[in-house]
Amino acid sequence: MAVHAYSARYEPDWPDHVFPTEKYRLVAERLRAAGKTLVEPDAATREQLLLVHTPEYLDRLERMTESPELGYMEFEVPCTRTTVEAFKLSAGGSILAARRALEDGAAGNVGGGFHHAFADRGEGFCLINDLAVLIRVLQAEGRIRRAAVIDLDLHQGNGTARIFRDDPDVYTFSMHQEHNYPVKERSTWDIGLDDYAGDDDYLPLLREAVPKILDGHKPDLVVYQAGADCYEQDKLGLLKLSKGGIAERDKIVYRACRERKLPVVTTLGGGYPVRTEDVAEIHSRSLLLLDDPPGSLT
């Protein structure tokens, strides 16, 4: 059974913000109701964060907690002490989940996926790039050499792409809405989708892409960014995937990993629907599918 990293402290207080931080608690409640195991992570240490982020940036984050409103100018979120600690905890959760994925074959983080953070700055609600941190930590520990990031958030993983741009051991794949935030960086492979692309546009492209990536790169670990903002009722995006289409998206990734006996760690990424219950349902299904027997992923 897949283990999932979670802390109640993942949820900073961002009143009236478009990012529904309460989704983490709602997803955790759904996982507990399904009998899943949730494990409290330790916060990522400064030493671990320095494998990705510059010391100047980490120092600036600490200073900004003295004037939290400055965070809106760079990250579009308040840079409070609880916010910074939430991001460190979420990075720790991604590290924990990645280690468990290597042991058990699959694991998830009820959080994470902050793919807009660069080595020396944050943006787009993202302060710490936990995807990059987990990869660099596992490489430093000698647990992996090669990794593949499959980023299916509606927005391109620009920070992740930039961090690994010159590293042939880390394959970055992003399939996203082309005409939307952010300014694009160059991933190993980008598929930019037209506005209003739906299930029938999206899923055939993904079915073709994922096996090519895994067979060509042969990663030791697959890092899956299972963003929910491709949902047809998302407030910040114009992709039109149904809930069933998003579940099939997840199955395509998991099926390909299982067929090749590749460990996969899942992070949640974005999701800004009209109803927070919808994003909680989508995210929890992405994590619950990690435990589906192979024969059911059809």
Spans of features found by a protein language model:
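HDAC/HDAC-like amidohydrolase catalytic core signature
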Residues: 1-298
